[in-house]
Structures are given as C-alpha cells and as structure tokens.
Amino acid sequence: SEKDVKEEDLNKILEAGRVAPTSHNNQPQRIYVVKSEEAKEKLMKDFAYNYKAPCYLVCGYNVDEVWRNDLDGDRESGDIDVSIVITHMMLMAEELGLGACWIGRITPELVKKNLDIPENVKVVAVLSLGYHREDDKPSKLHTIRRSNEELVKFL
C-alpha cells in the first residue's frame, strides 16, 4: 500500500542493515532513504515501472572502504557486502509486516546523478518498502521453486 512507513519500523530495518556482517567488518554500505516526493520523483526518472512505494532505500557502498581479497586478484567485497545488508533489511521488513522489493534494473550512474550521491559511492540496488495490501498475493515468479535435488550437491 502507499501508507507511510512508520519511523520506528524504518529505524529497525536500517538497524538490521547496520549490524549485518560485512567483510572484515569494514561496513562500507551507504543507504540513502528516499521518502520525500521530490526525491522519489528524481529516483523514478530511471525506473521502467512505478512501484508506488512510500519509501525507497538506495543501497551502495563506499569504494574506499571495501575489503580487497589479495588471493583473488584484489576482488572487492562491496557488492557482496551490500547484498548481505539488503537481505538483512528485507528480512526485517517482512518480520515487521512490510513488503520489500529488490530493484536491480537501474542505471547506477543516473541514480547517483539524480540524487547527488557522492562519486566514491557505488550504487548496487534500490529497495522499495511498503506495507502489504490486504489483497496482496505473490506473483507466479515467486511461487515456482526448484527442488533441493536440483540445487544442492552433497560432497
């Protein structure tokens, strides 16, 4: 629904993201809370679909604060760290009775430009947040699951 997200619920969701594990506990995540109509309008410029959510979390990381794995070509932890943070926030949202949708079909540079996000922050995804409508049902994409036999191999 378009009902505003309670500040108390939003703070619990953000806290779940803050305490989520990150590589070497570097905590490179940066979360931008988009609630004002003006900010939502700027964010929507990049969306193919209007989610009509009362709140969005633009999720990224400070590229200067990520851990680099020297055993794997200095691979950066940022995308993984932010994915863990987003997952923790989604789980908390669901626990509080909110729906959350991971929006990955974005143009990160355009989101950064439209919202004046600093150059040293890499935007990974946007999370929409809102309370479920009473008639909400999962889409077909969310009800079809593969079996563990297909996905897991015991060694």
Name the predicted role of every residue range.
Residues 1-155:
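Acidic, surface-exposed loops and disordered segments
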